[in-house]
């Protein structure tokens, strides 16, 4: 399994993979309430969260953790960085994201 990725690949995964889309494809518990994206934090299990669409980050206000798509995938799938990037690359290839 390749361990090196281009800067462009990593930038695209962090910035172009929509976090609501990713939550849906991971089958991760989430919903919208009053315009706010509420999700179960993969670190602490709480649902005090929101999405910053300009930065493509989600934040858990309980454990004070920010997640980009790669970080969220690592936490949700309990995998390392390389596995998470490979998973996201395969997912985006199948859905023609890039």
Residue ranges and their predicted role:
Residues 1-98:
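N-terminal structured subdomain of primase-like DNA metabolism proteins
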């Amino acid at each position: 399994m390749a361990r090196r990725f281009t800067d462009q690949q990593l930038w695209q995964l962090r910035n172009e993979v929509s976090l609501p889309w990713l939550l849906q494809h991971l089958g991760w518990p989430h919903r919208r309430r009053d315009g706010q994206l509420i999700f179960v934090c993969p670190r602490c299990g709480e649902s005090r969260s929101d999405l910053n669409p300009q930065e493509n980050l989600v934040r858990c206000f309980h454990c004070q953790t920010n997640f980009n798509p790669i970080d969220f995938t690592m936490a949700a799938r309990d995998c390392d960085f390389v596995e998470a990037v490979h998973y996201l690359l395969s997912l985006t290839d199948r859905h023609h994201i890039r």
